[in-house]
Amino acid sequence: MNIILALKRPFIWLSRVRHRCGYGVHSPFAFELITCLFYEKTPYYAYKELAQEEKKQKRNHGKGWRNESLKVKRLLFRLVNRIQPGTIIDFGTPSSSSLYLQFGKATADYTFASELSELFLEADVPVDFLYIHCHQSPVLVEDVFRICLARVVQQSVFVIRGIHYSKAMKNLWERLKADDRVGITFDLYDVGILFFDKTKIKQHYIVNF
């Protein structure tokens, strides 16, 4: 984690506290997501198994295995478990989040890539779920977003890590959520979540996650 961001964390939390628990959210879809998915505390059956598998993978991969925030990893699991995507694209540095994505729906067509040259998308196959976690390179984030944007369908969901990591990432997040093809978005600080269901009114929500 960026050290400066870590030091600022308590102040960031306080500045966003009014956005907790869905206060002021009138959209039934957004309110249900915030209260029943983002803040869900259910001890899923898979959490224990995931923790055990993480230990094994960490031993196998060593320092090349990035250990991300448990809160974010569990959110990824819950999102995939709820949406049940047919395809999952995981783009970034090899990390333990890959386990949570795959456990969310074991039968999904899961693809990992760390470079654009590895991002092979079969013709006419939609991108149902995209997780981008290479926020140290905003240009790469945008490139991956644009490539996968051409494959979105109504139920697609994109999750972008580090939207507040730098000024460049903040500016990029503003551009992405303003795209005409994007619908409802959520700023959870650690991640930004974009939906593409245009049957719902486009709105941008801040959530103190």
Briefly describe each language-model feature range.
Residues 1-131, 135-154, 164-209:
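A short alpha-helical cap/connector motif
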